[in-house]
């Protein structure tokens, strides 16, 4: 079912501290300590629940369904049980979603910008990721990363983020797996044979192609990494005008039409 990952994530969130909307990366490997400098750790009093991507000194990009009332953003994290000298913590100064009501709980356009309460200092473990300059090419090998589950449906969470390389697939592959989904503003990515995927806990994190963020982990099938059930990602390129407008201070900028 198209929304089953999100629903399962919400259920797990009630049961476990590290439970976020998606499991950990399936079929991947430990990320190098210095290759995820833009990856941020979103948590609250209940624990870790999502990831996000640092775009510049004061803006983070994540999924709208990662919205919470008491978000804290930790930057410069690798091993969650270790405190790093350059680790920094921020809270939202402002949260912006595509919906005219700023209702970040809708799943229609799963994208959210967080303006941080103070500027972030770049460091050995902290650096921004570039927005896409072009649309991703079909078949491109891209990397998704996060602290989500390593196994599914069994619950095994990592202390360090994991990475996995997957392919950009034709949107019809995901539409065949999830008949109710729209093709608007979404990317389909994974491997057709299964075994590699993002999952609960990876929500909001980046799908990186050629050192640019092309996707935001959104939803997919559950259990994760099944045959012919790729992941679904928010297509960042379709929101470039909105993202750049908001960051530039243009409060009148609008998202692509949400008429699906």
From Swiss-Prot:
Completely inhibited by NPGB, PMSF, diisopropylfluorophosphate (DFP), benzamidine and soybean trypsin inhibitor. Not inhibited by EDTA. Disulfide bonds join 31-163, 50-66, 98-255, 142-209, 174-188, 199-224. It comes from the Eukaryota. Residues 25-248 form the Peptidase S1 domain. The active site is at residues 65, 110, 203. It is found in: Secreted. GO terms for molecular function: serine-type endopeptidase activity; toxin activity. Monomer. Belongs to the peptidase S1 family. Snake venom subfamily. This is Alpha- and beta-fibrinogenase OhS1. The lineage of its organism: Eukaryota, Metazoa, Chordata, Craniata, Vertebrata.
